[in-house]
Amino acid sequence: QKKGFCAGYCSYSCAKTDEWTFHQTCGKMYCCIPPPKKG
């Protein structure tokens, strides 16, 4: 399933705990997806 937006945030550098992917809305930046918060 393709969403029309990055599920996390667009950045040139993601946090070490983030998953990352490429997304068209982020252009040349990464789409950083933070892990789900526990608690």
Swiss-Prot record:
Positions of disulphide bridges: C6-C32, C10-C26, C14-C31
Localization: Secreted
Pyrrolidone carboxylic acid: residues carrying this PTM: Q1
Keyword field contains Cell wall biogenesis/degradation: no
Main location: secreted
Thermal dependence, as annotated: Denaturation temperature (Td) is 101.2 degrees Celsius.
Keyword list, A-Z: Disulfide bond, Pyrrolidone carboxylic acid, Secreted
Gene3D superfamilies: Antimicrobial Peptide, Beta-defensin 2, Chain A (3.10.360.10)
Recorded family membership: Belongs to the transferrin family.
Protein name (Swiss-Prot/TrEMBL): Small basic protein 1
Record organism: Anas platyrhynchos (Mallard)
